[in-house]
Amino acid sequence: MEIELIRKNLDGIRIERRGGLQKRFRIVEPDLQPNETKDKIGNVGKVVRLQSNFTKFSVNKSEKYIMYDTTFSKMGLSPKLKLQILVRICKEYNLPGSFCYDGRRLFTSDNWTEGSDIKEFTIDEKKVSLRLVSTFLSDTEEYYQMINVLLNNLQIIMGQEKIGKGYFLGSNSNKDNVVKNIGPTFFETNNFKVLGGFGTTLQRGTRPNGQLTTLLYIERINRVLNDNSVLVTYNRKNIDQLIGRDILTKYNNKTYRISEIKEMNINETFEMVGRTLSYAQYFKERYNINLTTEQQPFVLTRVKKIARRDKRKEHNENEAPEDMDLTLNITGELCFLCGFSDQEKSNIDLQKNLGCVLKRGPRERLDDIPSFCDWIKTNNNSQGMSNKWGLKIDNTPLEIEGRELPHCDVISGGQRINEKIKDDWKFGKVQFNVQKGVKHEIDVVIVDRNDSQYGNFLNDVEYEIKQLRFDAKIGRVLVCSANDVERSLNDVMRSGSGCAKIALVFVPDDRVYAKVKSFTISTGLLTQCVTTRNGTNRNDKRRQVVSSKTVMQIFSKFGYDPWTIDIKMRPTMIVGMDTFHNKGSKKSIHASVFSINSTFSQYMSFANSPKGKQEFHDTLSGNFKAALTEFKRIYKILPVRIMVYRDGVGDSQLQFTKQFEVDAMKPLVENIYKENGCQVPQIIYVIVKKRIGTKLFNRGDNANPGTIVDKEIVKPNFFEFFLVSQRVTRGTASPTNYNVLEDTRYQNKAGIIEAITPNELQRITYTLTHLYFNWMGTIRVPVPVHYAHKLAELIGKVHKGSTPALINERIRNRLFYL
């Protein structure tokens, strides 16, 4: 029984014996693709030659590599100082081979402990102990970790500092001490610093002939830092805007997230290792910093302390120490905000000033690889380490083969409304297919303003309605204060006149917006919000653009499609899933949307905040059952294929997602189909990743929408592809990564079992990027994923950590979150 359980848990994972003294087994990266996957490369579309931000890479090969755990006798040393000590040890003890160090683990190409497991070295009365952990070969997971550590060490040696997870110019850099025209960039304006750096990652790739290869990803990265401390920017009225923001503490270059802000005195005390210290004492003794303001805001940040586990003493899981959540109190004058607030993001002048650094074009990005190579070659500090390792980096971007998928015809009113050379279309060509005999009424709610200021906007709305030939009118106009907005919305609900009704609400701020949307979710009254700024805009062109989008959103919420795309395939339900993590709370909102029509334009929506795996499975089961029941009510059959697009999952979470989401979902769906006496459907589960560093270029410019790459830069153990679906007018277009975790395959009437082909999957995915009814063009991800994201974000921001209300059944099948 135990052997079978072990075999089941290790199914799909390749295991190899590792060398070295301990003779243990090493788990290699699992094969995260559907069973019996044979064909992963498509062939439809025009073949194009592309460039990427990957390049070829090599180091001197060794028979084996060794990993050590390090212990330093002196506490509190920074990784940079530890690295310098290890460099001295290597020289003074004449240790063989090359090495790199990540702050805890030491990787070497030769043995430093001379046959024993543990050895101790001494430099300037500082003792360093090495304990052998493992030995490994090249082209293993440990090897890739080691090379990534080597590249990080090179950046430290060349003067970079670790800030968060990346390596950048130091936080105290200024324009006078930054080398120009080579290496990391630096920019300063409006109390903001943009600290430059390089992101580097080694990963597996596949050559055109199918052989494995090693590729190096290189890209310039930036960190935006506000020169004003939290002490300067803080006031009691803006606490909500600061909660959830990231801060940097310059004394140790660490980043934290603000969980809470509390006014305290720097002479207040706390316990630390048997001593009672004031905050002023602590920062003076530890960092030689004199705090200047006695009473000031303190940033409270929650961090997880990982318990140190001694595997030699632990015999079962109950004996293992538990991780703990700790709260750190940091004085506001030492905390500097990272990134932008919502107000700063909407500051056009500020974003324009920083755009030259943050939104670089494709031709500038193509220079990243040669710039990084030149920086290493011309930096004297890096030569010793790079020469020892035999480091070779090709200074030209990797050329790869891609394809441009055929154009999709966007249909509205029976006619194609998009041009074949473009990926967007105009509002004037849109014709809604409105149900005859149904009247529509739009009641207006104006918050904290005089109704006469909105006359021009309402006239624009009426004009757009006439252009679209809707049987609709603007009804009552209600004016109220922010505190009475729910009462006015109740008046709109009670004034039922046999019409399909929606409330057009002009909101002055996010607080009122949250009230309106909370009312929508709980009562089922459709609402369309417009900001006060847009509703009172005196610029005719800008106001008319907003009014046309507003009308399109209103009638999309009524359940009408402004356009469609013909997707010919067997009866299919497409599901979008995403998770919203509230920065100021531990609660997460899991949203899922299920297509309930053949054109994949209308969706049934669910939002849950499950606690634990069992509750997640229960809510997932209930959501699938309700959506499949609705699908059957409409079409009299259940779908023969279910395609799930799942966002919000990183590479490190793929194994967990496959085990606890995919493998749990399959029996849930099977049970529902068996209860209905139907054949189990084909289930396809695709992970969608937007936040990736990969860039694709076509002849020095952005890749065209519809560009697919499914070879060379894809991982050999994944069934994945990259798709550029959106055109950008400024900066560089980013592809989206799609990774197929599961395909249960389909059994046709002849009994033949078929997997989805790469061509079909890529075509469906690209087509679904055309169906977002808040933008007359393509978007970066398939529309169900984007709708799930919009829904999760709306619920998360409205409820801010509290348990979300159930979505009212009146709007569950409507796009109320547009």
From Swiss-Prot:
Residues of the Piwi domain: 501-800
Give start and end of each PAZ domain: 220-339
Instruction: Name the CDD domains on file.
Output: Piwi_piwi-like_Euk (cd04658)
Quote the PROSITE patterns the UniProt record gives: PAZ, PIWI
GO MF annotations, alphabetized? RNA binding
Protein origin, superkingdom:
Eukaryota
Q: List this protein's GO terms for biological process.
A: regulatory ncRNA-mediated gene silencing
One matching Pfam family, short form? Piwi
Q: Which UniProt keywords apply?
A: RNA-mediated gene silencing
The record, for InterPro entries, names:
PAZ_dom, PAZ_dom_sf, Piwi, RNaseH-like_sf, RNaseH_sf
Tell me which family the UniProt entry assigns to this protein: Belongs to the argonaute family. Piwi subfamily.
Q: What is this protein called?
A: Piwi-like protein
Q: Which organism is it from?
A: Dugesia japonica (Planarian)
